[in-house]
Amino acid sequence: MNRLPPVALVFLGGALGAIIRWTLTVWIPALGDPTRVLGAATPLNIIGGIPLGDIALLVVNVLGALLLGLLVGMIPDSAHPRRTFWGTGVLGGFTSFSSLAAAVDATTDSASTILIGGTYGVFTLALGLIAAAMGLRLGRDLNELARLRRAADGADEPQDPHEPHKGGAR
């Protein structure tokens, strides 16, 4: 992975993320009604006026925000190849703001459904921000824990050869 140029990492990761998102947003609604034809809305695949495909998109976007926060917390270097592949690539392809906008637009096609669509959009954004903050906090905590473990093992930073080794955690 370290040998690929960043554009290749983003391309490959984005393709993988988009395929995973598409799979989840197609197959989660099918779980609500296994007999349904793809794209057909039946009473079994609608919850509170929102199609299960849009619920699946909400899950995908919130999960993606959580994972991106976790990744950023664990790998602070934005140019790191793993962060480029997993963050910009996979999670960038996995989450979809444009699909969210289309879902809100489709849900607000009449005056009676504007409240449902608007609530869905605001709820998705709020949950995404909360999930990203939680992921970022968890990622930073995990990164700090790993740093402390390396320090306890004496492998955190190269030691100054002129300074005597004190042993143990610093």
UniProtKB/Swiss-Prot annotation:
**What is stated about the way this protein's activity is regulated?**
Na(+) is not transported, but it plays an essential structural role and its presence is essential for fluoride channel function.
Q: Where can this protein be found?
A: Cell membrane
Its principal location? Answer: membrane
Q: Which reaction does it catalyse?
A: fluoride(in) = fluoride(out)
Could you list this entry's UniProt keywords, alphabetically sorted. Answer: Cell membrane, Ion channel, Ion transport, Membrane, Metal-binding, Sodium, Transmembrane, Transmembrane helix, Transport
A Pfam family (short name) is CRCB
Protein's GO biological process: cellular detoxification of fluoride
Q: How does it sit in the membrane?
A: Multi-pass membrane protein
Bilayer-crossing regions:
8-28, 55-75, 84-104, 114-134
User: What would be an example GO MF term here?
Assistant: metal ion binding
Give binding positions for Na(+). Answer: 92, 95
Q: Which family does it belong to?
A: Belongs to the fluoride channel Fluc/FEX (TC 1.A.43) family.
The protein's job, in short, is:
Fluoride-specific ion channel. Important for reducing fluoride concentration in the cell, thus reducing its toxicity.
The name this protein goes by in its record: Fluoride-specific ion channel FluC 2
Q: Taxonomy-wise, where does this protein's organism fall, top ranks first? A: Bacteria, Bacillati, Actinomycetota, Actinomycetes, Mycobacteriales
Corresponding gene? fluC2
